[in-house]
Amino acid sequence: RERERVKLFYQIHCLVEDLSLENIAKLEQTIAPFSAFSSIEFLDITDKELEPRHNYRKLDVLIASEIKKLYLKLNAFSQKRFSKMIMCRFFFASLFHQYDKMIMFDVDTLFVNDMSESFFIPLETHYFGAVREKDLIAINRNSAKDLYELRQMHAKTIGVADAFPNLEEAQILFDNYFNAGFLALNLKSWRKENLENQLIAFFLLKNEKLLFSDQDALCFVCRGRILELPYSYNAHPSFLDTPSFPSIKESRMLHFWGDKPWKLFSVIGAKKWHEALIQTPFKDAYFNAPFLDHLFESFQNRDKEIKEIYALKKALSFSDKRHSFEFLLPRLSSKLLIEFLLFKAKQKVKRLIRRVF
C-alpha cells in the first residue's frame, strides 16, 4: 500500500509477558509473507531474567516495577479480569521513545480492512484519537444519568465504590466516553505536557474505584483533548449492520470486548476470526479434537435433542453464514474426525457405567 507515492511500512511491536520461543516463532512465521512491508518486535514486561534475543527485548526495570505496582492497586474484579498489560497504556511515550506518533490496539481484535489511514489523521493538540464508546446507544440509553446509574450498578455488583460518585463527574466521563481498544497516539504531546505523570497521579487518586481502570483514567484526564475517530476503526461485531451503526463491510477492525470468539462460537464475527486463525501457524495447535468437542458442545447446548453427529454437521454448515464453520471442512482430516467421534463414544460409555454402578 502507498500514500503519496511512498510505500508504507508496518513496524509491529508486541507487548508480551514471558512469551514462549514457540509462540514467538509462530508470530514471526505469521507475518513472514508480508516481510516486504512489515516486521515484528517484542517487548517483554516480565520481571524475570531474559536472555537477549533478536527482535526481543525486556522492558526497562523501573517501568516494569511501576506497572506492577499500579496493577496491584486495581480492585479484585479488575485484577481477575485483566492482566497487568493494561497498565502499559500509561507509559507509551516512555516505552516507545523513538516515535512521535503510533497506533495501539488490543489483542482481542481482528483487522478486516486497512487501517493505515488512521495514522495520517491530523491529531494537532489532541492526545489521541479514539472511537466513542457505543454500548449505551446499543441498549437505548444515552445520557450521563444513564451512564451514572449503570456504573453504580456495576460498582455494587463487584463490591467497590465508583470513582465518579456524582452526576457532575459522570457528565465529564460521558462527554469523553471513548473505547481504549484502538488509539491513534500523539506521543509528542504526551511528552511535552508530561501526560504520563498526570495519568499515574489520577490513577493513584482513584485506584481501586476505577471500574475500567486505564480507560477511565485516559478518558477523564484527557477530556477535551480526544479526537473522535470513525466507528469503523473499533467496531463491536454485534452492533454492525444495525440502525445507528455502519455495515460490517465498512468496518476496519472488529473488537471482541465482550464474549471472545475462541470461547463462544456463536459470537458474531467468530467465523471471520477463525478464518484468519486457520491461515496462521497456530492452526495445528488450535484445530484439534478438544476444539471439535468445544464446537460440538456449543451447538449441542442450544438443542438437547440434536444427535451428536448431526450437531457436528450443523456446526460446520450453520444456516446463518455469519456463524458458519463450513470453511473448516476441507481442513479437517479423517483422523481428527475419528478421534472426535471416539472421544464422544468414550464419554457415553463412562456415563453408562456410572448409571449401572
What are these regions (language model features)?
Residues 22-37, 144-147:
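Short, aromatic/basic amphipathic alpha-helical patches
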Residues 1-6:
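Histidine-anchored nucleotide/phosphate-binding helix
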Residues 105:
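Catalytic metal- and UDP-sugar-binding loop of GT-A-like glycosyltransferases, i.e.
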Residues 159-164, 169, 173, 179-357:
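A glycosyltransferase accessory/donor-loop signature
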Residues 10-18, 130-132:
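Short internal beta-strands
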Residues 102:
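Short aromatic/hydrophobic "clamp" motif used to bind/position activated sugar donors
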Residues 109-144:
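Conserved donor-nucleotide/metal-binding helix-loop-beta segment in metal-dependent transferases, i.e.
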Residues 33-92:
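Active-site-proximal specificity loops/subdomain of glycosyltransferases
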